[in-house]
Amino acid sequence: MRLAGLLLLVMTAVVPAEALRLEKVNYGDFSHWITRHIKESSVLGGNTKTIYAIGPSYTVNGARAFKPSGGTPWATSNVYAKVSGVTKASGSVTPFDRGGGNKCAKMETIMEKVKVAGLLNMNVVVPGTIYFGQVFEPITSTKNPYAKMEMGIPYTKRPAALVYDYKVVIPAGNTRTKATGFGSPKTLQGRDDCEVYVMLQRRWEDAKGNIYAKRVGTGRERFSRSSNGWVTGHQLPIHYGDITGKSYYKPYMGLLDGSKAYYARNSKGKIVPVHEIGWDSADATPTHVLVMMSSGSGEAYVGTVGNTLYVDNIAFGF
């Protein structure tokens, strides 16, 4: 009986994805993409660069500020920038064919270079990233990158896991590059990781328009080595309440405030930091969900060039 009980415990400890009730994320199968053709400034060559956004299939021609449409929750690190009057497009997220026309999202850490004689000479490390939210274009500088995007969308459910397919490619070596757009790129010791997270928050706003949050649920994982091809139906468990005393807790799962705070639009229309001030009760109902998938896991403008994360079939599991 004790052996039978142990076997039952082992069998039920990890619930296979097919046993979960899956709610697909809008456009989380990455079958549809918005194609953006942006003509860069003549001082950069005047070429037309193509970048992509996740959403209904259509094409946008010209350097226009992009806003999500068609019910897509997704934003990406692909942006239209205009720095010192120079128009530039950056694309570190692209559609990728898994085979037979089955598209997925490919995120790659790249080095963007902007060089204009006597005016600009910028090198910027850009990890490929997709996330729930919106980026505010055009990007006009590399300062305070989190203030240029809104992280998270309204959401009140309590899923057990984020379910997705993935493939990871990590290049050989043990270094990262720091390139912020100011000064020469620097080589740092230690390799960057690819990362996926889902966080549930309960947010509120005070009379002055400040936004606060408590963490309701947390799922966060990093990938430090290449996978053996595609991993399908992978589950990232979401743990509820204060997890700091749990065996699976890692420092990078902690609260987001100060320099780590993300931003959101308050009721006055202003973009302000979301101050995550504590852990909520394990049975709390969230107001927002944050989902992010990236070829990097470090600070802004730091990464291992060539890190690549492929993802597909994103869903919440219940």
Where are these regions (language model features)?
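Aromatic (Trp/Tyr/Phe) and Gly/Pro-enriched flexible surface segments
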Residues: L20-P159, V163, K178, Q189-D242, ...
